[in-house]
Amino acid sequence: MSDPLTHFNDQNRAKMVDVTAKQVTARTATATGTIRMQPATLDRIHAGTMKKGDVLAVAQVAGIMAAKQTSNLIPMCHLIPLTGVDIHFTDNNQDTITATATVKTKHVTGVEIEALLAVQTTLLTIYDMCKAIDRGMVIDNVHLVEKDGGKSGHFQFGEAPESQA
């Protein structure tokens, strides 16, 4: 069995994994996370009355931009040509917004980190745009929901490890 910690060389120092021999395949990753806030904050987001502008539109663009910049921010991530990034929002009409990012590529390595970074940046942007009226917002439950493609195959959050490829 090979060592699962592939980002270390034979001197136990960090390295970028060599993906030269890997096959190009279609790959998709979806991540999600939530931000909890005061009900009045969510009401103002819905009403479009935040001084900084359309919170969800700006957060959506920020998340897309973040996915495209992943290799500049996470040292061992490869520069991956993304073929799609989509951010969706849902909320409970009370105090929570959920952001979900789906990232796609046709490349030799996956886009899980791109999806996770997109979600985190989306949620941080919501925080930034609303912090003047609600500094008690909480970002949580950020995780990979699903990934598909590549040698490791399909992953679905919550599946038992033995059923994952």
Curated annotation (Swiss-Prot):
Q: Name one GO molecular function term.
A: cyclic pyranopterin monophosphate synthase activity
The record ties this protein, via InterPro entries, to: MoaC (IPR023045), MoaC_bact/euk (IPR047594), MoaC_sf (IPR036522), MoCo_biosynth_MoaA/MoaC (IPR050105), Mopterin_CF_biosynth-C_dom (IPR002820)
Q: Which reaction does it catalyse?
A: (8S)-3',8-cyclo-7,8-dihydroguanosine 5'-triphosphate = cyclic pyranopterin phosphate + diphosphate
Where, by residue number, does substrate bind? M76, C77, H78, I113, E114
Q: Which domain of life is it from?
A: Bacteria
Active-site residues, Swiss-Prot/TrEMBL = D128
One Pfam family assigned to this protein is MoaC
Keyword annotations for this protein, in alphabetical order, are: Lyase, Molybdenum cofactor biosynthesis
Pathway(s) of this molecule: Cofactor biosynthesis; molybdopterin biosynthesis
GO process annotations (BP): Mo-molybdopterin cofactor biosynthetic process
EC numbers listed for it are: 4.6.1.17
Q: How does it assemble?
A: Homohexamer; trimer of dimers.
Q: Which family does it belong to?
A: Belongs to the MoaC family.
Briefly state the protein's biological role.
Catalyzes the conversion of (8S)-3',8-cyclo-7,8-dihydroguanosine 5'-triphosphate to cyclic pyranopterin monophosphate (cPMP).
Q: Which NCBIfam families match?
A: moaC (TIGR00581), PRK09364.1 (NF006870)
Q: What is this protein called?
A: Cyclic pyranopterin monophosphate synthase
